[in-house]
Amino acid sequence: AGHSCGGAQVLANAKDPRIKTYLILNAGMGDMEMAGASPKSLKNLHAPILYLVGGKGDVAWPNAQKDYDAIKRVPVVLADNTQSGHDGTYRQEFGGDNSRMVSNWLDWLFKDVKEHDALFKQGDLKGYTGWTIKSKNFKE
């Protein structure tokens, strides 16, 4: 997991076979190169990936959108807390909705919490006001 520039560090290490999921928080490569990562790093992904951004006011929003479009081989979700900006909701108690989204992702992947299927596969944002979400590359 990595926030902001830390997202590039995650992608720079995408080949690591120990990785079971990627969390790219308020980050994205787009067309840039930094921290040892570039758009080519997306080809090294081998596990499901969650991008979480903060709307068009988030400096990372356009790059996350480009990454989502470029990822073809692994399941990818782009969750957009449209009004939260680049800092997200992490300063709120317990990290706010952004932390809840990440927790639901981890529970869904690693604890097989089926109730989150609708959230991550069908975009059912019940309980997430002001969000949009899209996903692709999941096997049915």
Question: PLM features: residue spans?
Answer:
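Short glycine-enriched nucleophile-adjacent loop
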Residues: G7-D16
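Alpha/beta-hydrolase-fold serine-hydrolase catalytic core, especially in secreted/extracellular enzymes
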Residues: V74, Q83, Q92-E140
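Short, solvent-exposed loop/turn elements at domain surfaces
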Residues: Q9, D87-T89, H116
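The feature captures the conserved acid-bearing segment of alpha/beta-hydrolase catalytic domains
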Residues: K15, K20-Q92
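Conserved alpha/beta-hydrolase "nucleophile elbow" surrounding the catalytic nucleophile
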Residues: A1-S4
